[in-house]
């Protein structure tokens, strides 16, 4: 990190980096821009940023190694991301894959393989704290007589999913020693649709609670759980979580709303950040409650790490959220869906890993901001899709070029139906992490000064950095091959 004029100057760093490249080890080099005196022990801001980016991404790599992705179910509705690829998880992330059939939930519910005391505590807390909202189903699709049974069922599902991921020593005390161990899962996915949800209450409450900074036990560390068992979005959520320690928003990248379309549908002309249009990020009934943006820091709406989350944040988050009887058009077995609208203009980063046959994994990154819409405008747009689902309006930062020429171009270039949204502009750290794992980035809007990759990447070209990234990742190959 020291930029000095004395012997050997930058020579030792340059020599070391050249040697590493020559033997195929892509090392990172940190060299400050301004010359420092030899007795100056301060760390310049540019060096500090590089050190933190490297350490944060490196810790994420280390935390993933040896952990599991737990597939709870199989492929949801033919979604490609639900096809859990063990080569990707093993070769690129150093993770293993574990699998259960969704009938394991049925077995544990029917045979009482959960802590009955915790169930009573959880059920009471959920009924006292989760506000049940309007049933938006047509009258012939409404089943109010089943609601209480649905609440009991989804509470048990939530406890069981957590036990499957992390284990629960209480189960051993109850005589279920094998089940007490769990699967050592740092991330999981729940299939749900359609085989489960056509018959049983859906997994929306399960996914929502586990992804959130709190539950009936109080404020605690969230888990990472992907809707529809989309393992690639789950891995993307995991990246964001490990880099920030904040809960991740799982969303459908559902609709691009042009300013003209918004005005035509609502009579309101978009302004401010929304003037160029927006992306409607709306998941099918679940996402972290922290996505409501009701936590506050220095007067600003934020998403906090669990260890900064306060009781006031929890109360505001619950107040902003309603749980509606699930659309029985989608979910014949019933259940409940989470609804909120993300508050404030929060800086966020949306990312997604996609797999391409013959190429391998690639990553997309879009930094931008959430926006709020007037209530009547938001209501009208929500009615056009699903009013009972969690809603985040997202405006990516535009560069005027390529995939970020317009908001429409971002939507058009997005590689799949889902995205993982993290609080903060963390695109630079995602790029650093991706380079460590040899995952090329096929689109991003991160300013050049925040991009930090191994020094050897410059040996693959300096004019087109995107192309050089692909060549370098292909040459060095996955970390765990």
Question: Model segments located where?
Answer:
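Short beta-strand elements of ligand-binding domains
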Residues: 1-2, 188
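Cap/lid and interdomain-hinge subdomains that line or gate substrate/regulatory clefts
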Residues: 2-150
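Anaerobic metallocofactor- and corrinoid-dependent redox/one-carbon enzyme cores
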Residues: 92-93, 122, 133, 138-141, ...
């Amino acid at each position: 990190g020291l930029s000095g004029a004395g012997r050997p100057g930058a020579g030792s760093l340059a020599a070391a980096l050249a040697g590493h490249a020559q033997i195929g080890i892509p090392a990172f080099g940190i060299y400050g821009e301004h010359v420092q005196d030899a007795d100056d022990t301060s760390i310049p801001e540019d060096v500090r940023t590089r050190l933190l980016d490297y350490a944060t991404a490196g810790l994420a790599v280390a935390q993933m190694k040896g952990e599991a992705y737990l597939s709870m179910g199989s492929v949801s509705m033919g979604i490609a991301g639900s096809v859990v690829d063990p080569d990707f998880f093993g070769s690129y992330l150093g993770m293993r894959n574990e699998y259960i059939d969704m009938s394991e939930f049925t077995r544990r519910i029917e045979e009482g393989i959960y802590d009955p005391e915790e169930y009573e505590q959880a059920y009471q807390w959920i009924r006292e704290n989760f506000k049940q909202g309007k049933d938006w189903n047509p009258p012939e699709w409404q089943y109010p007589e089943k609601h209480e049974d649905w609440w009991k069922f989804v509470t048990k599902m939530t406890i069981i999913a957590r036990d499957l991921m992390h284990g629960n020593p209480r189960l051993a005390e109850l005589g279920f020693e094998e089940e007490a161990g769990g699967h050592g899962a740092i991330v999981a996915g729940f299939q749900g649709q359609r085989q489960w949800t056509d018959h049983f209450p859906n997994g929306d409450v399960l996914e929502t609670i586990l992804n959130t900074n709190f539950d009936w036990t109080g404020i605690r560390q969230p888990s990472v759980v992907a809707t529809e068992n989309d393992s690639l979005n789950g891995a993307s959520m995991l990246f964001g979580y490990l880099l920030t320690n904040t809960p991740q928003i799982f969303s459908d990248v559902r609709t691009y709303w042009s300013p003209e379309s918004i005005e035509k549908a609502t009579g309101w002309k978009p302004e401010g950040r929304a003037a160029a249009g927006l992306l409607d990020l709306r998941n099918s009934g679940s996402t972290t409650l922290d996505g409501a943006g009701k936590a506050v820091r220095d007067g600003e709406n934020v998403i906090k790490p669990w260890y900064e989350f306060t009781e006031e944040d929890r109360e505001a988050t619950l107040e902003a959220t309603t749980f509606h009887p699930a659309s029985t058009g989608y979910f014949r077995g019933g259940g409940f869906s989470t609804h909120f609208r993300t508050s404030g203009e929060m800086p966020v980063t949306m990312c997604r890993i996609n797999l391409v046959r013959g190429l391998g994994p690639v990553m997309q990154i879009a930094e931008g901001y959430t926006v709020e819409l007037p209530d009547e405008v938001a209501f009208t747009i929500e009615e056009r899709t699903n009013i009972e689902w969690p809603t985040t309006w997202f405006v990516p930062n535009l560069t005027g070029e390529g995939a970020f020429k317009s908001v429409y171009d971002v939507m058009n270039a997005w590689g799949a139906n889902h995205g993982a949204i993290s609080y903060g502009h963390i695109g630079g750290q995602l790029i650093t992490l991706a380079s460590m794992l040899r995952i090329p980035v096929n689109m991003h809007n991160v300013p050049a000064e925040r991009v930090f990759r191994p020094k050897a990447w410059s040996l693959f070209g300096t004019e087109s950095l995107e192309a050089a990234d692909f060549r370098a990742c292909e040459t060095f190959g996955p970390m765990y091959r």
